[in-house]
């Protein structure tokens, strides 16, 4: 999903920076508020960031100028809500661009919007919509949809940048999305399953924290213990 350095036209790269910046600033404020409100959540916050970094660092070949990989942002969105993920995801993408040459600095704004803004919000919508139906299903959908939404947005960004020789945006979008789908749909399903296992584990080792964050009720944590 990470769009490579220099792959977007400068004007479009700047536009995505402009679109993403308010979300990142709001996210930074949300992180500060969260830490002040609940200092004990810092460890889980760091773990969510590490989880996102580890999963999104997995790099599989895909569309020219990009790559396929899990995102891990759905878990952080469930735990801390999307504004926090905008800031965490930005740090993850920045470090990956600098340390791993994964993504790029000029394309950071576009990558932030797809992976740290759009994906988490779509995943969180699934969590809110299905959490009262079945928590495991809600976690699965949140993780999988956060992943898939990221790649839909990335396909859109690439189609805008490269609409094809005839300028057909729709055809270009379909081309990018179909190539991503080959690897990304299986990855999204796998990420959803991993998310279910992760939260089953967290209810056992971090039950009080999940209750305090409002992710699970005390009764749900006790039932899972």
Language-model regions, residue ranges each:
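Hydrophobic alpha-helical transmembrane segments
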Residues: 14, 42-47, 86-90, 113, ...
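Membrane-interface loop-to-helix entry segments
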Residues: 11-15, 109-115, 186
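Membrane-helix interface motif
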Residues: 155-167
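Hydrophobic transmembrane alpha-helices
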Residues: 2-75
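C-terminal transmembrane helix-loop-helix hairpin of multi-pass membrane proteins
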Residues: 139-148, 168-225
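Short helix-perturbing small/polar motifs within transmembrane alpha-helices
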Residues: 114-155
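Alpha-helical membrane segments and adjacent membrane-interface helices in multi-pass membrane proteins
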Residues: 56-119
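Hydrophobic cores of alpha-helical transmembrane segments in multi-pass inner/ER membrane proteins
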Residues: 17-23, 116-126, 189-200
């Amino acid at each position: 999903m990470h769009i490579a350095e220099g792959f977007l036209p400068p004007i479009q790269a700047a536009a995505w920076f402009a679109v993403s910046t308010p979300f990142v600033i709001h996210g930074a404020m949300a992180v500060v508020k969260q830490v002040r409100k609940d200092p004990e959540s810092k460890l889980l916050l760091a773990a969510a960031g590490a989880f996102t970094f580890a999963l999104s660092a997995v790099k599989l070949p895909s569309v020219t100028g990009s790559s396929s990989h899990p995102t891990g942002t759905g878990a952080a969105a469930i735990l801390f809500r999307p504004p926090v993920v905008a800031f965490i995801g930005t740090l993850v993408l920045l470090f990956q661009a600098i340390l791993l040459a994964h993504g790029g600095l000029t394309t950071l704004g576009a990558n932030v919007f797809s992976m740290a803004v759009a994906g988490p919000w779509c995943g969180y919508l699934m969590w809110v919509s299905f959490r009262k139906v079945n928590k495991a299903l809600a976690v699965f959908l949140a993780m999988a949809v956060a992943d898939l939404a990221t790649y839909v947005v990335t396909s859109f960004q690439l189609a805008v940048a490269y609409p094809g020789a005839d300028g057909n945006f729709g055809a270009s979008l379909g081309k990018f999305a179909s190539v991503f789908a080959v690897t990304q749909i299986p990855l999204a399903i796998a990420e959803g399953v991993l998310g279910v296992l992760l939260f089953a584990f967290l209810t056992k080792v971090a039950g009080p924290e999940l209750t305090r964050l409002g992710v699970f009720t005390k009764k749900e944590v006790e039932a899972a213990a």
